[in-house]
Amino acid sequence: QISSHYDTSIFNYFAEDSNEVLKISNNQKRTLRYGENPHQKGMFFGDFDAIFTQLHGKELSYNNLLDVDAATNLMQEFLDDGPTFAIMKHNNACGLSTRDSIKEAYECALAGDPVSAFGGVLISNTEIDKETAELINTLFCEVLIAPSYDADGLEILKQKKNRILLESKPLHANKQSVRSVLNGFLVQDKDTAIETASSLQNATTKEPSAHEVKDLLFANKISKHTKSNTIVLAKGLQSV
């Protein structure tokens, strides 16, 4: 089993640019409490600890991992932006905002849809400080993800024993996405396209202002990671 996994790793390394053969092998398995529903078995194959350090809370569930994946992929779009906070529910962002401080970003993200935020997965692109932790602590959330937490903030967030606190590490994402369908797999390159102001084409007689262009690009990043047919409304770098 070990040598087979090793051989597959070597093959995939040298065949990186080839689409002729798909080989998947992973010898790191995490058994989950159950799958999407309690009557389904669930497993995760991958090195979770290479991406996150779990600082607190219960074991992650199958559905938690889906939301954590969606949240992480979304926040990759905002790593170079100012303090940004997103709230995920069922793999979609129900609130997201970029502000001058992470506290403001959280408050504005929550204001986008405070009802759906209940029981969601929260993610920040910067450190969670004490002030922000105090606000988050009043909300029931399944998971909170951040690159770091200050000591006081972490102690506050640990007051809820089941709340999952993850410290994120730099992500080296897969270049392709794979999905099981019928008796095979669908494989495609991940969408890494980045829209800029120069790539926008005005479809009306009214020219957008510089602030409106920023909001358009902001909303477009969210739309890219929203499931199904999508309309994202944004104003002032905040989803509404």
PLM region descriptions:
Residues Q1-Y149, G153-D191, E212-T230:
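Active-site loops and adjacent core secondary-structure elements that bind or stabilize anionic groups
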Residues E195-A210:
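Active-site/ligand-binding-proximal alpha/beta "capping" segment
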Residues N229-V240:
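Conserved structured catalytic cores and adjacent interaction surfaces
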